[in-house]
Amino acid sequence: MRNRAYTISPSLIPNEMKRNGLKPIEANQTRLTADERALVTAAKKARLRAHAHQSQFKVGAAARYGNEIVLGCNVESDSYGLTNCAERTAVFSAHASGIARKGLRMIAVIADSPEPVSPCGACRQVLFEQGGPDLRVIMCNTRGDVRVATLAELLPGGFRLETTPPRRAAAVAKPRKATKRGPADAP
């Protein structure tokens, strides 16, 4: 039996996107607001700081918290599993600098890819927890293609601890008491 390569006809892609609730790729950024264009520009600058010595795939992100923009870039590790994505770097930087309390309003992400780059599953989960299902995600590539979606479109049914059954949530939130043997975390 011969292996066959299958391709998807480009004419089917818009229908597939429509079925999944994604907006079509814009050929340019003219449909973005001035605030969104500023966020994309900031993400482009952040991309230049990426440390992608393993993959050479540099990604930049810019997150809007109130009136402030927090930058993030991917930082790769020789132990590839320890690599941190641009989107999570931006979110974690916002927490480290105390800006996260202003609330995540939107995020832009950009890479040199054939299609606008989309956050990975781990980033989608973190963004869902930080910005909620209505968070606006602006996905771009360096060619100027843009796709805009909400987190609910990218991560339907996103997980939050508060959505777990009350008994389980209480058990998770309840700290363990110290015993005579030692502190709560002792074996």
Feature names for model-found ranges:
Residues 96-101:
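Phosphate/pyrophosphate-binding loops at sites that engage ATP/ADP/AMP, CoA/4′-phosphopantetheine
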Residues 66-77, 103-106:
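Glycine/charged-rich beta-loop-alpha catalytic/anionic-binding loops adjacent to active sites
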Residues 65-68, 141-143:
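Short acidic-glycine loop/turn motifs at beta-strand connectors
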Residues 54-65:
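Short beta-strand scaffold segments in enzyme catalytic cores
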Residues 74-89:
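Compact, glycine-rich, soluble single-domain proteins
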Residues 42-45, 86-94:
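Short, well-ordered amphipathic alpha-helical segments that serve as non-catalytic structural scaffolds
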Residues 8-49, 102-187:
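C-terminal binding/interaction regions
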Residues 3-6:
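Intrinsic-disorder-associated, low-complexity terminal segments enriched in Asp/Asn/His/Tyr and depleted
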